[in-house]
C-alpha cells in the first residue's frame, strides 16, 4: 500500500516546489522516501502565459490604435485643414458609436461652413458687381446733366427751344438719379433690423385687386391683357399692407416696362388650405435660364444690357419687402417665354370665409374680355 502526503508548497518567483512523502508498505519491508519534484512544466506554462499576455497587449494596442487613435488623427487633420480654409475635407472611417456620431456631426458642420463660405464669396462678388453697376447708372445721367448744364452755362445754345429741351433733359436725368438714390435707400432700409414690421391681419386678395385696378389704365394704354384670378372667399393673413402694395406695384411696373405690347399678364391668388400662393405671370420676353436663380439680386437684368432707364433694383425691392411676410419666394421660367414670380405664406388658423367683391365684378369682366 502506498500512501502519499502533500507536506507543503513553496512558490518562489515562478517556480513551485511540491514535496511528497511516500509511505510504502510492501510485506515486512518499510521504507520512506522523500521526493522533491521541481515543477518545470509550471515554469514553462508561466512563460507561455507571459508570451500570450504580451501578444494580447500588442494586438489590443493595435486594435485600439485602429479603432480610436486612427479616427482621432483623422479628425485632427480635418480640423487643421478646415482651419486653413479647406472645407472639401470629409471624414470617412469606421469606429464605435461615439466616434461615428462625431464624424456625422463634423461632416454636417463642414458642409454648413462650406455653404456659408460660398454664400459669403457670392455676396462679395455681388457687392462688387453692384458697385460697378451703380457707378455706371450714376455716371450716365450725371454725365448727361453736366454736359447739358455746361452747354447752357457757356452760352452754346442760343435757341430758346433748344434751351428748353436741354433743361427738360436735365430734369429727366435728375429724376433718374433721384429714383436710383430712392431705391438704394429703400433697399438699405429693408435690410435694417430696426425696420418696423407693422404687420396686421388683412385681406390679401383685396390688396391684390386694388393694385390691379390701379394699373388697369396703364395696361389698356400699352395693350396688355390682365387676367385677375382671385377667389371669391376672403382670406385673412399676416401682412404689412404698405410693403405688399409696393411690392406688387414694383412687379407690375417691371412687367409694363420690360415687355412688348400685347403681353398677357396674370395675377392669381390661390388658397391651398395650408398656404396662400400669390403668383404674377407674363408671357413677355422672359429671362434666360441661367438668370433664374439670380434674377432677384440687385442690378441683374434679363437682357444683360444696361441701356434702359430703370435702376436695376426692381425685383430685389419687392423680394425684400415680401420677405417680411412670406414663407418662400421663387421664380420660374417656362421654355424662356413664360415668366412667373411666386410668393407663399403659411396659414395660421385663419380659415377663409366669403367676401362679396361688388367692386371687382366690372373689372373681372373687362379683364376677361381682353
From Swiss-Prot:
EC number assigned by the record:
2.7.13.3
GO MF assignments: ATP binding; phosphoprotein phosphatase activity; phosphorelay sensor kinase activity
**Primary residence:** membrane
Q: Where is the HAMP domain?
A: 66-118
Q: What are the BP-aspect GO terms?
A: cellular response to phosphate starvation
Span of the signal peptide: none
What are the alphabetically sorted keywords of the record?
A: ATP-binding, Cell membrane, Kinase, Membrane, Nucleotide-binding, Phosphoprotein, Transferase, Transmembrane, Transmembrane helix, Two-component regulatory system
Q: Which enzyme class, named as a word? A: transferase
Q: List the catalytic activities from the record.
A: ATP + protein L-histidine = ADP + protein N-phospho-L-histidine
Q: Which residues form the Histidine kinase domain?
A: 133-355
What are the subcellular locations of this protein?
Cell membrane
* Gene Ontology annotations for the cellular component aspect, listed alphabetically: plasma membrane
Q: Quote the InterPro entries the UniProt record gives.
A: 2-comp_sensor_kinase, HAMP_dom, HATPase_C_sf, His_kinase_dom, HisK_dim/P_dom, HisK_dim/P_sf, Sig_transdc_His_kin-like_C
TM segment ranges: 2-22, 40-60
Q: How does it sit in the membrane?
A: Multi-pass membrane protein
This chain's function reads: Member of the two-component regulatory system GtcS/GtcR which may act in the control of the transcription of the grs operon which encodes the multienzymes involved in the biosynthesis of the peptide antibiotic gramicidin S. Probably activates GtcR by phosphorylation.
Q: What is this protein called?
A: Sensor protein GtcS
